Amino acid sequence: MEHLLKTDPEVFDAVVKEYERQFYNLEMIASENFTSLAVMEATGSVLTNKYAEGLPGKRYYGGCEYVDVVENLAIERAKKLFGAEHANVQPHSGSQANMAVYFAVLNPGDTIMGMDLAHGGHLTHGAKVNFSGKLYNVIHYGVNPETELIDYDQLYKLAKEHKPKLIVGGASAYPRVFDWAKMREIADEVGALFMVDMAHYAGLIAGGVYPNPVPYAQFVTSTTHKTLRGPRSGFILTTKEYAKAVDKSVFPGIQGGPLMHVIAAKAVAFKEAMSEEFKEYAKQVVENARVLAEELKKYGFKIVTGGTDSHIVLVDLRNKNIIGKDAEKALEKAGITVNKNAVPFDPLPPTKTSGIRIGTAALTTRGMKEDEMRKIAGWINEVLSNMDDEKTIQRVRQEVRELCETFPLYPELKRRIDELRSGKATDL
């Protein structure tokens, strides 16, 4: 970071402050994680200088022999990790991965089915404010009001009635497992294609603790930065039948040159996810979430669906008479970072919400386990029971800081920053 400090002290200062925020706070936003230093090194490598439109061996630029090596590694590792016939690792994000699949098999005005955003779905699954809701005729399925689990009977009835061309599975705030086999069965019966957006669950699937949709879906999309613990990006898995259509849809359909430095980081992340250590990590992520959910229930919090099968704990705050927006702010003051989130059949708008979404992926990366989850549940209860008590909030803030120091984040980076700040660095 010495070059950044010398060239642009203002950006250096902002980066360091963000590092310190991550270090001294409990990052519990379910879509966030901490990459390895190897992933960050790949992202910051000389590959950022290279244009490489096209696919390995079929580029529109010269000098691509080494970026071809990198992209082929990423492709083969993604296929092996998830058991897929074909992978495209060029999408810049999960949203663009979804767009590429839509553009590959749909025409404007076609009918698609996706999970209602208010029930845990994602913007790109047909929300009105998103391109997917503007270009396509969207029918939403949701959860049962009693169990808060996906209502497959409703999904089936809607599919029979509306005959969608594509059914989309996956979510951004659904803590339980999906029945991929049942969804594929419904899709086949109505003549629909089946796509799964596994962005939130990809790392858990790679680790073998969450059902793999690849055997059931013609298309599987994902980000790489959530539970998969890679760079901020996306990828697509598909069958040989749809490989050419997907590749053409990504380039030249919706993107130009791929980000080769990010593809290198994806290759690294896929390799890391193949390890036994990663399998243990994924298992611990889910165990931490389950313990956190059970502890919060002991304090009287209502957990949506009654628990979790993943890294997500969705808390309905209505029985506590707390608005999600206020809970998010109070917890942030205490050093606990979560996000306000709608709960099923939420009467409040998304700017306020009746719930919060909590995730365990990032803290598990830091090495925290069940005992820490119990402690954190207690802090969440203390803060949300005393939201106007500054003394309580500051006491919890100090205790959070002490816990974070026990599980240091990127200690090598901290030492380097300290050297640069003190002027002791010798290679400026």
UniProtKB/Swiss-Prot annotation:
PTM-bearing positions, type N6-(pyridoxal phosphate)lysine: K226
GO biological processes: glycine biosynthetic process from serine; tetrahydrofolate interconversion; tetrahydrofolate metabolic process
PROSITE patterns the UniProt entry points to: SHMT
Entry cofactors: pyridoxal 5'-phosphate
UniProt-annotated location(s): Cytoplasm
Residues under site feature: Plays an important role in substrate specificity: H225
EC numbers: 2.1.2.1
Entry keyword annotation includes Magnesium: no
SUPFAM superfamilies in alphabetical order: PLP-dependent transferases
Keywords: Amino-acid biosynthesis, Cytoplasm, One-carbon metabolism, Pyridoxal phosphate, Transferase
GO CC list: cytoplasm; cytosol
The UniProt record lists the keyword Cell membrane: no
Residues at which (6S)-5,6,7,8-tetrahydrofolate binds: L117, G121, H122, L123
Pathway stated in the Swiss-Prot or TrEMBL entry: One-carbon metabolism; tetrahydrofolate interconversion; Amino-acid biosynthesis; glycine biosynthesis; glycine from L-serine: step 1/1
InterPro entries noted in UniProt: PyrdxlP-dep_Trfase, PyrdxlP-dep_Trfase_major, PyrdxlP-dep_Trfase_small, Ser_HO-MeTrfase, Ser_HO-MeTrfase-like, Ser_HO-MeTrfase_PLP_BS, SHMT-like_dom
Reactions it catalyzes: (6R)-5,10-methylene-5,6,7,8-tetrahydrofolate + glycine + H2O = (6S)-5,6,7,8-tetrahydrofolate + L-serine
Sample GO molecular function, one term: pyridoxal phosphate binding
Entry function: Catalyzes the reversible interconversion of serine and glycine with tetrahydrofolate (THF) serving as the one-carbon carrier. This reaction serves as the major source of one-carbon groups required for the biosynthesis of purines, thymidylate, methionine, and other important biomolecules. Also exhibits THF-independent aldolase activity toward beta-hydroxyamino acids, producing glycine and aldehydes, via a retro-aldol mechanism.
Family classification: Belongs to the SHMT family.
Subunit: Homodimer.
Protein name per UniProt: Serine hydroxymethyltransferase
Source organism of the structure: Aquifex aeolicus (strain VF5)
Lineage: Bacteria, Pseudomonadati, Aquificota, Aquificia, Aquificales
